[in-house]
Design a protein with these regions (language model features):
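Acyl-donor (CoA/ACP) binding surface of acyl/acetyltransferases
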Residues: 1-39, 71-197, 202
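Acetyl-CoA-dependent GNAT
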Residues: 46-98, 102-104, 198-233
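Short histidine-centered catalytic/ligand-binding loop motif
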Residues: 40-44
């Protein structure tokens, strides 16, 4: 990245740091784990030699160069538990995020803690305007992680990724710097009262745009579906 270093970066429980060759065996071990690799696109098996090449290829860097990618180690109490992938476009203003976590540490909140800290640092100190992420549509846990960080679902690319010999769909999410503060400062308490109001021509457009998280749509009907049910019972 530019002159200022991105790493190391500390969170309440984690240290985000550059990889070292001492991490190669651990990186290879969890990247070969079927539970970790299931929704990822790296070649399998992910050998120690492949891990060493990845680490050596970014030696001396503390973050991605413009137009490149960089793997960030997620360290918990001196132990490698996963990694973040960070890509930057040529302008340095558009970032792409990826993440993977050891299967025995999934469900710990480490991935969202690490990704959230990285995103905040990119927005606050490095002039990044937008962070994007893509995922396998079947990876509901990853979609929920992005939703918890404030990402917005932007659509599905049909057969847009060639993964291990097959064309696959991917779901696309993004978060703007302008939206991050609003998300972090949103109200977490239930409203004191709820009022039912008539839908009128003046408010219909706003009502129609109401939505829930993508992963909750099978529990909560969309507004277009609700309108259709009311009009055509």
């Amino acid at each position: 990245m530019d002159d200022q270093p991105l790493l190391p970066l500390r969170t309440p429980r984690l240290l985000l740091r550059p990889f070292t060759l001492a991490d190669a065996a651990g990186l290879a071990a969890y990247r070969t784990d079927p539970e970790v690799a299931r929704y990822q696109d790296w070649a399998l098996p992910f050998t120690i030699e492949a891990a060493e090449r990845l680490i050596a290829g970014q030696a001396g860097l503390a973050g991605p160069e413009r137009g490149g990618w960089y793997q960030i180690a997620i360290d918990h109490d001196g132990e490698l538990v996963g990694d973040l992938a960070l890509g930057l476009d040529e302008t340095g203003q558009l970032a792409t995020l990826g993440y993977s976590l050891r299967s025995d540490r999934q469900g710990s909140g480490f991935a969202s803690e690490a990704a959230g800290a990285l995103i905040d640092q990119l927005f606050a100190s490095f002039g990044v305007h937008r962070v994007a992420a893509t995922l396998d549509p079947a990876n509901i846990a990853s979609a929920r992680l992005l939703e918890r960080l404030g990402f917005r679902y932007e659509g599905r690319g049909v057969q847009s990724a060639f993964v291990r010999g097959n064309w696959a769909d991917d779901d696309r999410y993004a978060l703007l710097r302008a939206d991050r503060d609003g998300w972090l400062n949103r109200s977490r308490t239930p409203p004191a009262e709820v009022r039912l109001v008539e839908i009128t021509p003046e408010n219909a457009r706003a009502v129609f745009r109401l939505a829930t998280h993508r992963t909750q749509e099978h529990f909560v009907a969309t507004m277009p579906s609700s309108f259709a049910d009311a009009l055509f019972p």
